[in-house]
């Protein structure tokens, strides 16, 4: 689909249009404590959670200031940073980047078959957002000059807390505060890029990023499992092999303003992955019920 067709299609869903909130929705929310301790106790993990209703302005928060390893949720922000480079004339969507055997790290569903050839910048972004391809993320980081430009990207959003310390897959390994964020930062960054009227992303590039986030097949048992039928979910998952199970995104109802949601669950190492995912789904259901959006 071309850029114009993509933008038209997302507008028809109400995704682009309802990403332009009125003054009341754009106002700063006052965080409300949203006690999820019972949910944590049931599965023995630690959950950081934010649900921001852009219609009412209510923002439900649990452990919003605590740090969590973000894992692959960062990849949608990496794509956004790359799109801003395209807008600035520093990068081109169609530029081909060689893919070598030495670039390979675990989880390479798109780049693995491309070894010895090349993929476009756009294809690498799509791969890293839709199917969380790790070499694609590293190639995009290298293309922008390493980790410092990503740090600058977050600072440009007003986020001085999110850490960017390592490449894939090392960034998924718990090591103090390295490669961590706070749930309130994750939610605020989503709002700044995908909802605010003065987002730095152009309409076409925002629509492109949203399409990848909507079409991703990852994490169907996380946020998606907790929303009512008929809602559109644009999200990005992140998973560590020792318990971290994350999902962040924007939830678009059939009518009305969207809800921003950021969930970072650090489950116990021995907890089955399905149970860790169910925690996020249940927290989503509880939040939407509390907000009167269920």
Where are these regions (language model features)?
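Active-site SXXK
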Residues: 57, 69-97, 261
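Short, glycine/proline-biased beta-turn/loop segments that scaffold the active-site neighborhood
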Residues: 88-113
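Structured C-terminal helix/loop/strand segments within mature extracytoplasmic catalytic/sensor domains
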Residues: 2-8, 21-36, 143, 194-220, ...
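N-terminal secretory signal peptides
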Residues: 1, 12-14
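Beta-lactamase-like hydrolase cores
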Residues: 22-69
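Conserved catalytic neighborhood of penicillin-recognizing serine enzymes
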Residues: 104-139, 147
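Mid-domain, small-residue-enriched loop/turn segments at the edges of structured enzyme/sensor domains
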Residues: 138-197
């Amino acid at each position: 689909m071309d850029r114009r067709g993509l933008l038209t299609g997302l507008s028809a869903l109400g995704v682009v249009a309802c990403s332009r909130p009125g003054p009341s929705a754009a106002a700063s929310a006052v965080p409300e404590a949203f006690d999820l301790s019972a949910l944590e106790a049931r599965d023995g993990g630690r959950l950081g959670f934010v649900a921001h209703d852009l219609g009412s302005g209510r923002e439900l928060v649990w452990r919003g200031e605590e740090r969590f390893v973000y894992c692959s949720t960062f990849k949608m922000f990496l794509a956004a940073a790359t799109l801003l480079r395209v807008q600035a004339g520093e990068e081109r969507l169609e530029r081909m980047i060689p893919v070598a055997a030495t670039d390979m790290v675990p989880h390479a569903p798109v780049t693995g078959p491309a070894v010895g050839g090349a993929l476009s910048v756009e294809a690498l972004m799509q791969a890293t957002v839709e199917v969380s391809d790790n070499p694609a993320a590293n190639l995009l980081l290298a293309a922008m000059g390493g980790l410092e430009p990503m740090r600058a990207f977050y600072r440009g959003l007003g986020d001085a807390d999110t850490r960017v310390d390592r490449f894939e897959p090392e960034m998924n390994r718990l090591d103090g505060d390295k490669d961590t964020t706070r749930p309130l930062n994750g939610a605020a960054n989503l709002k700044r890029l995908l909802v605010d009227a003065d987002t730095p992303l152009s309409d076409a590039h925002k629509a492109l990023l949203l399409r990848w986030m909507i079409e991703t097949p990852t994490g169907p048992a996380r946020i998606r499992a907790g929303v009512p039928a008929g809602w559109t979910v644009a999200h990005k998952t992140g998973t560590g092999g020792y318990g971290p199970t994350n999902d962040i995104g924007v939830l678009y109802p059939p009518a009305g303003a969207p809800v921003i949601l950021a969930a970072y669950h650090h489950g116990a190492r021995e907890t089955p992955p399905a149970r860790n995912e169910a925690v996020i789904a249940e927290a989503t259901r509880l939040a939407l019920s509390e907000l009167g959006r269920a």
